[in-house]
């Protein structure tokens, strides 16, 4: 079991200000980890892969989870406060995908601080883009799904 009380997770639906706050904290000198999902989507687009949520949600979740696990493990010795734009469990809940045994074990054995920062839907700032294709109704449903994962973080 790896318990990291200095690892803080920002979670919630898409387009609600998590990344904006993460970037602000980084500018203030805090140590931050950007969201893996957007990096996976960009990599898949560049390589012509199908591991994106609108083509193959399972592959997307597996790629995102593996990246999140690798980042967590690589930073296990970090003693500074670290803010994560989403946690290991976020992608599979947000996409209604059954987690692999590897992911279930990773969630069970890698623990962030119990204080999780949850960002609720915020319609006034919500925007779609090439990587965030959910309409507002889907963004709200995603938030509800993310809430179900909180006990696992």
Predicted regions and their residues:
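Glycine-rich phosphate-binding loop used to anchor ATP phosphates in small-molecule kinases
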Residues: 61-111
């Amino acid at each position: 079991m790896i318990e990291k009380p200095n690892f803080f997770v920002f979670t919630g639906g898409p387009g609600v200000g998590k990344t904006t706050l993460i970037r602000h904290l980084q500018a203030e000198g805090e140590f931050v980890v950007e969201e893996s999902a957007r990096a996976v989507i960009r990599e898949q687009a560049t390589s012509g892969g199908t591991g994106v949520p609108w083509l193959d949600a399972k592959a997307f979740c597996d790629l995102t989870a593996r990246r999140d696990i690798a980042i967590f493990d690589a930073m296990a010795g970090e003693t500074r406060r670290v803010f994560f734009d989403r946690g290991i469990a976020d992608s599979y809940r947000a996409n209604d995908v059954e987690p692999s045994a590897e992911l279930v074990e990773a969630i069970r054995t890698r623990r962030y601080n119990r204080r999780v920062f949850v960002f609720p839907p915020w319609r006034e700032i919500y925007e779609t883009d090439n990587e965030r294709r959910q309409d507002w109704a889907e963004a709200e449903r995603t938030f509800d799904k993310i809430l179900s994962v909180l006990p696992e973080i």
